[in-house]
């Protein structure tokens, strides 16, 4: 931030016309014996308490030295070429004004942000009447760290006991210890080598897109199919909660000039994607904007609550270039974002028990479990500690709780569910939050049983996590299996190709196609390797592709009406196609299905370089 101090005998301003879509109320004004602070907010400035208090104290110190009876904060975009975005600049100027008011004993004024203004001044002309300053956010890091240290971390057991994380006995709870090391003591463990899952990503066509921005992926046909299957499954899981769920679709760009959007965006901080057009637009970082913008126009009765709304939202977060991780930490990803609208906090807490059960059930289907971090506000912790104990009891193991002082959050509870990955690192996958602020921010209302207008409490959740992170958990599970000497095998419902038919010779191709037709008619994804390659190479290629059922057919199989099956991780056997179909249908029961996203015949597919 750059500021210019002018000690004036008199100063006045008059609002002329809007300069920005994001602006304050158009108020003209003036002051006598005023220290006028021409204020330019620069890129990289943050609305951080320590940073703003540092600036405010300097302003007040100068005002007291020159014996000014008032201070005027005057937004001024002409002291730097590195300007902050308007929404960020306005927030910082407004917060600076509030901090200066709390520090100064005289009158404090603020000229409105976002307008062309005329001003008149008479500078007093003494040695301290004209001063300039430059402030950097880094100077306030010590205060920020001190603020972080005020957060209280507690380990809560299923029996309700509380423990200091530094003194807790972690025997039998090694995963919790890893999470505590990272979250409480800020020690990142594990790593040190390339994770095995990256090799799997290349196999199925999950790749960075080098012609786009950092952190953007592309998805080959196999990867696209897997992504869309997970999207379908996320909707099915949401419907399994036993509440009505509405699935929607919307835009990914929203105007920062909308007060609710701008206010919500400020909560997210610096990781925003901004698009410059006729007006500043933000790329959404979750489905919140679209769902809330839609629901605010609905007429809702208490009888219709709770209900959910789901969108698989393409989401954008401006992660640091060195922090992006394929399939895990991305600048653009897909979030099956479910919001559940409830009457009040009590109902929201009751619904979260169902969510909690679903979250652990789904990760359990992958053969994994979570270790949990519960971020709670201090007031919520004091009022609802027993609720957290109940969640620990349901998990059957201790949980880590972080108690945050103050009321600066729109949520009262934000739960992170972590797996410990192949390299021993905590990796957040699923989440839920209880939100008590956004209904009022966006104007979402319902009518209660007494015909009174109320604001619902909103649960945010991704039961599976983002689509990419769910697949990350799948592939990390396979990496752990391979580390233990087992052949990695995708769940059959997620396998891009579920059955591959390999004719021994060209003479057997007709029978291979007939068998493939039977599988396809039953909704099973099947292809045929009709390439002019040796049988051993074609079998090997199918194994490398992790096809769960490789069916070799020759003259003998054709005569007997069977296929010779090589089941991944399950041995070899001969079976009629109809019996294998029954086995596969049982294997994929309860999961979504989509057709093959590639030509059936391998000879028609180009190879990737």
From Swiss-Prot:
UniProt signal peptide: none
Keyword Disulfide bond among record annotations: no
Complex formation: Homodimer.
Compartments reported by the entry: Cytoplasm
Region annotation Catalytic: where it falls in the sequence: 195-491, 196-491
SUPFAM superfamilies according to UniProt: Class II aaRS ABD-related, Class II aaRS and biotin synthetases
EC number in record: 6.1.1.3
Record: residues binding Zn(2+): 288, 339, 460
Similarity annotation: Belongs to the class-II aminoacyl-tRNA synthetase family.
Species this chain originates from: Pyrobaculum neutrophilum (strain DSM 2338 / JCM 9278 / NBRC 100436 / V24Sta) (Thermoproteus neutrophilus)
One GO MF term attached to the UniProt entry: zinc ion binding
PROSITE patterns for this protein: AA_TRNA_LIGASE_II
CC cofactor: Zn(2+)
Gene Ontology biological process terms in this record: threonyl-tRNA aminoacylation
Major subcellular location class: cytoplasm
Name listed for the protein in its UniProt record: Threonine--tRNA ligase
Co-factor binding comment: Binds 1 zinc ion per subunit.
Phylogenetic placement of the source organism: Archaea, Thermoproteota, Thermoprotei, Thermoproteales, Thermoproteaceae
Enzyme class: ligase
Record's function text: Catalyzes the attachment of threonine to tRNA(Thr) in a two-step reaction: L-threonine is first activated by ATP to form Thr-AMP and then transferred to the acceptor end of tRNA(Thr). Also edits incorrectly charged L-seryl-tRNA(Thr).
UniProt keyword list: Aminoacyl-tRNA synthetase, ATP-binding, Cytoplasm, Ligase, Metal-binding, Nucleotide-binding, Protein biosynthesis, RNA-binding, tRNA-binding, Zinc
InterPro entries: aa-tRNA-synt_IIb (IPR002314), aa-tRNA-synth_II (IPR006195), aa-tRNA-synth_II/BPL/LPL (IPR045864), Anticodon-bd (IPR004154), Anticodon-bd_dom_sf (IPR036621), DTD-like_sf (IPR023509), Thr-tRNA-ligase_IIa (IPR002320), Threonyl-tRNA_syn_edit_dom_arc (IPR015011)
């Amino acid at each position: 931030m750059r500021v210019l101090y002018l000690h004036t005998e008199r100063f006045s301003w008059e609002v002329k016309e809007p300069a920005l879509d994001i602006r304050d109320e158009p108020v003209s004004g003036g002051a006598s014996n005023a220290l006028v602070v021409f204020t330019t907010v620069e890129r990289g400035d943050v609305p951080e308490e320590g940073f703003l208090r540092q600036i405010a104290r300097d302003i007040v110190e100068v005002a007291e030295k020159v014996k000014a009876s008032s201070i005027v904060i005057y937004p001024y975009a002409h002291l730097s070429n590195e300007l902050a975005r308007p929404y960020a600049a306005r927030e910082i100027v407004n917060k600076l004004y509030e901090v200066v008011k709390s520090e100064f004993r005289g009158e404090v004024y603020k000229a409105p942000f976002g307008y062309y203004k005329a001003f008149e001044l008479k500078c007093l002309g003494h040695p301290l009447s004209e001063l300039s300053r430059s402030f950097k956010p880094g100077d306030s890091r010590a205060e920020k760290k001190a603020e972080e240290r005020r957060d209280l971390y507690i380990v809560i057991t299923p029996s309700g006991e509380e423990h200091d994380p530094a003194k807790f006995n972690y025997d039998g709870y090694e995963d919790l210890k890893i999470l505590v090391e990272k979250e409480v003591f800020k020690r990142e463990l594990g790593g040190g080598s390339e994770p095995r899952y990256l090799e799997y990503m290349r196999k199925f066509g999950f790749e960075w897109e080098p012609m786009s921005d950092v952190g953007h992926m592309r998805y080959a046909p196999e990867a696209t199919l897997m992504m869309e299957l997970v999207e379908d499954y996320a909707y099915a899981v949401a419907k399994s909660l036993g509440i009505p769920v509405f699935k929607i679709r919307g835009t990914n760009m929203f105007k920062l000039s909308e007060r609710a959007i701008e206010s919500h965006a400020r909560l997210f901080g610096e990781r925003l994607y901004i698009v410059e057009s006729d007006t500043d637009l933000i790329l959404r970082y979750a489905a919140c904007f679209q769902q809330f913008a839609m629901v605010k126009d609905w007429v809702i009765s208490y009888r219709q609550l709770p209900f959910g709304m789901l969108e698989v939202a393409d989401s954008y977060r401006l992660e640091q270039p060195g922090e992006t991780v394929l399939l895990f930490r991305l600048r653009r990803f897909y979030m099956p974002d479910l919001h559940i609208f409830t009457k009040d906090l009590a109902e929201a807490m009751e619904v979260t028990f169902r969510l909690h059960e679903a979250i652990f059930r789904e990760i359990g289907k992958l053969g994994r479990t979570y270790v949990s971090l519960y971020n709670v506000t201090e007031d919520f912790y004091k009022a609802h500690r027993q609720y957290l104990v109940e969640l620990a009891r349901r998990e059957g193991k201790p949980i880590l709780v972080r108690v945050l002082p103050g009321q600066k959050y729109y949520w009262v509870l934000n739960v992170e569910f972590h797996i410990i990955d192949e390299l021993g690192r905590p990796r957040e996958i699923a989440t839920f939050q209880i939100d008590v602020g956004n209904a009022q921010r966006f104007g979402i209302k319902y009518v209660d049983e007494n015909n009174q207008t109320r604001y619902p409490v909103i649960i945010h959740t991704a039961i599976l996590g983002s689509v990419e992170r769910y697949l990350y958990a799948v592939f990390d599970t396979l990496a752990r299996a391979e580390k233990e000497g087992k052949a990695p095998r995708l769940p059959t419902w997620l396998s891009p190709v579920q059955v591959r038919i390999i004719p021994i010779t060209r003479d057997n191709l007709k029978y291979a196609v007939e068998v493939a037709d039977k599988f396809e008619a039953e909704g099973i994804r099947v292809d045929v390797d009709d390439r002019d390659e040796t049988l051993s190479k074609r079998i090997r290629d199918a194994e490398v592709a992790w096809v769960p059922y490789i069916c070799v057919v020759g003259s003998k199989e054709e005569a007997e009406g069977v296929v010779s099956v090589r089941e991944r991780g399950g041995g070899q056997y001969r079976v009629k196609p109809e019996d294998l179909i029954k086995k596969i249908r049982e294997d994929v029961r309860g999961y979504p299905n989509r057709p093959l996203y590639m030509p059936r015949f391998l000879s028609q597919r180009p190879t990737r370089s």
